[in-house]
Amino acid sequence: MLLVIDIGNTHTVLGLFSGDTLVDHWRVATDARRTADELGFLIRGLLGQARRADGITGVSCCSTVPAALREVRTMSARWFPDAPLVVVEPGIRTGVPVLYDNPREVGADRIVNTLAAFTLHGGPAIVVDFGTSTNFDVVSARGEFLGGVLAPGIDISIDALASRAAQLVKVQVAKPRSVIGKNTVEALQAGIVYGFAAQVDGIVTRIAEQLPSRPVVIATGGLAPVVLDECRTVDVHDPWLTLTGLRLIFERNVPE
């Protein structure tokens, strides 16, 4: 089985593939201070609880946290010594031409999402990844990464508002009764849900105007369900898009 690890700034998502099928998945907090042994114990524990502790034949990983990535390398070598490790970084085969001023600036997760989106849905496409930041990644009709938009994420925006406005507090993210809030909590919820939905629709519309044909719009990321029902431009919700991309990149780099 293939273990895939997507390390984000806030959360780490792990998945287990048997062939093309995602058979299990977990979401844990990202902690850059977590050592290789702590990470190994954590993963072994998750696999053991799912009765899948043995049979890992490969590991594929992408990360936006360099310190955590170093520990993954050590963990994989110690805890899964017979399983080849593929880390998405410059020099790895992805099959994705990166049409960016400096390709090394592009986050590994964005390349992974581009590959998965094009493989599953074709192009042109726009991937909207709701994470610590909200990323809009643009895929050409030939599977090229064209660039995109990086915007503050939902949680970051909520935290900033609560910390900078003395009379506002952090609220539970939920759809309010109406876009016209009748109290402070509902007004904040309306701003979050409808504000971010409008951001998605507005940016997607502007990007689509720059493309030669209508793109398929794919939403992914842990915070997507917060606003997805209010987005008018999203065609597909795929919460495991990044995990699928990690599987595809592993297959491109490790022969069967």
UniProtKB/Swiss-Prot annotation:
UniProt main location, coarse: cytoplasm
InterPro entries in UniProt: ATPase_NBD, Type_III_PanK
Cofactors that this protein relies on: NH4(+); K(+)
Entry EC number(s): 2.7.1.33
Cofactor note: A monovalent cation. Ammonium or potassium.
Residues given in the record as substrate binding sites: Y100, G107, A108, D109, R110, T184
Ligand binding (ATP): D6, I7, G8, N9, T10, H11, T12, V13, T132
Coiled coil: none
Gene Ontology terms, MF aspect: ATP binding; metal ion binding; pantothenate kinase activity
HAMAP family per record: Pantothen_kinase_3 (MF_01274)
Oligomeric and partner information: Homodimer.
Protein name: Type III pantothenate kinase
Species whose genome carries this gene: Acidothermus cellulolyticus (strain ATCC 43068 / DSM 8971 / 11B)
Upper classification of the organism: Bacteria, Bacillati, Actinomycetota, Actinomycetes, Acidothermales
